[in-house]
């Protein structure tokens, strides 16, 4: 009996969150704000990638960033130097954000008027993938030192993401990491997954990623305008 109750509660939590996420997406569409949920392991280079990516995105878009961590404001302080609007979210021990937490963060950020908000989720390959934040795009980073077998071990995050960044390609010669193999493993989980090999350290590949994101955001907004016309 106890075990059945736990499963039922968990299902209810996910269902409630999914409904809240759909409402949030609709509200963001109405105000013209596109939300990206950025997920990865700790140390994969999320913040360094954003430092490279933001100046390119800011050429075309008004961008805000929400930095989620269990504690500390180091990342928010770093990102603020790019000139992007940024807030720090402390999760109080939670290993992920859900739609309700994301909504609260967007209100604090005053996201209305921004073209794009990037949520840098808590560093974790498991929990963040389980909760819909209301984002239009789930984007993940896998770094070369983590190994090319991660799609086999952590399938859900690869299944829920629309694109994967393979970061730290500048250290490929020093690690047993096969780019073709990780591509095959990842697309076994998600055949439509877009893959971008980059080096946040050198900047290699980042411009192609920025161009793809800008095109995707523009296309999404144009489709919404046509639907609402």
Residue ranges and their predicted role:
Residues 171-224:
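Canonical P-loop GTPase G-domain recognition
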Residues 3-26, 31-36, 44, 48, ...:
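Nucleotide-state-sensitive switch-loop elements of NTP-binding domains
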Residues 41-44, 204:
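ATP-binding Walker
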Residues 37, 69, 120, 167, ...:
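Residue-level signature of catalytic and energy-coupling elements of molecular machines
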Residues 156-160, 217-224, 228-229:
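ATP-dependent carboxylate-amine ligase
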Residues 1-16, 23, 201, 205, ...:
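Iron-sulfur (Fe-S) cluster-binding modules
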Residues 128-135, 142-192:
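Conserved C-terminal guanine-recognition region of P-loop GTPase G domains, centered on the G4
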């Amino acid at each position: 009996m106890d075990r059945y109750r736990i499963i039922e509660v968990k299902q209810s939590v996910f269902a409630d969150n999914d409904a809240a996420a759909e409402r949030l997406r609709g509200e963001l569409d109405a105000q013209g704000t596109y939300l990206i949920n950025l997920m990865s392991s700790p140390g994969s280079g999320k913040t360094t990638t954003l430092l490279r990516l933001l100046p390119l995105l800011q050429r075309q878009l008004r961008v805000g960033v929400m930095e989620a961590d269990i504690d500390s404001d180091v990342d928010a302080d770093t990102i603020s130097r790019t000139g992007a609007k940024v807030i720090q979210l402390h999760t109080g021990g939670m290993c992920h954000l859900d739609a309700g937490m994301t909504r609260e963060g967007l209100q604090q950020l005053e996201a209305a008027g921004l073209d794009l908000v990037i949520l840098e989720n808590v560093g974790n390959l498991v929990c963040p993938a389980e909760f819909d934040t209301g984002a239009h795009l789930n984007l993940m980073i896998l770094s070369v030192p983590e190994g090319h077998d991660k799609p086999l071990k952590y399938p859900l995050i690869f299944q829920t993401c629309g694109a994967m960044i393979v970061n730290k390609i500048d250290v490929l010669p020093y690690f047993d990491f096969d780019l073709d193999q990780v591509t095959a493993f990842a697309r076994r989980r998600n055949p439509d997954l877009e893959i971008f090999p980059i080096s946040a350290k050198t900047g290699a590949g980042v411009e192609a990623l920025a161009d793809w994101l800008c095109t995707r955001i523009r296309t999404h907004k144009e489709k919404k305008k046509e639907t609402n016309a």
